[in-house]
Amino acid sequence: GRLVKAFNTNTVINPIPVKYCKNINLANKLRKLCEDQIKDETIGIKAGGTGIQALKKLKEKEPFTAKVFKKRLVKSGQKVKINQHTKGIEVEVYYFIKKSFFDYKGKVTKSNVTKFIKFMGPCFEIVGFRQRNKKFTYLGDICGDFGFNIKFVVGRKTKFKKLNLNNLKTSLVSKKNGVKVNGNTNIVYINPLNSLRFVLNKVKKEKI
């Protein structure tokens, strides 16, 4: 209840008990319970905790999924308010999925995942906690807090093309202080399409 209120009012709360974070299964249950109480349109599903090195370090087998709500979506050019609990920004790829996917009975694989994609585009995810002085110790820390999502800033969608995103270097520069941060798509669960494959199979399995 406290997390849901924090989500709805854009406020922060004292940390939830660590027992809900240590066990990823409990964290997933908490996330789903909280998501079910949000009276807002679900516009997408994201993969969270996709950093391969982080997963190995945390001894977790796979990432998690989380709902993306309409009120969390921001169009390119709009302002986003942040606070000390905002932890960063991530460059992402988003995909629009064809309706035919929901009638498909088989498993989504690396070889067939592209046939379900209609559009694609760039986006930024603003990540952070709704809890005071929260530290990232377990995967459940970010999973249980609405998947660590604060806002999604989406760019223009284009018709899907089979682009090679396996080794795409990115660079973010702060206009305020000139700090530059480099990244690469190859650290995110192999590549964006593999993350999508994971999400689509979870959607089918859990009937999201």
Pin down the residues of each PLM region:
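Catalytic-core "active-site belt" of small-molecule-metabolizing enzymes
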Residues: G1-R197, K205
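Conserved metal-binding segment of the jelly-roll/cupin
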Residues: I208
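Conserved RNP beta-strands of RNA recognition motif
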Residues: L200
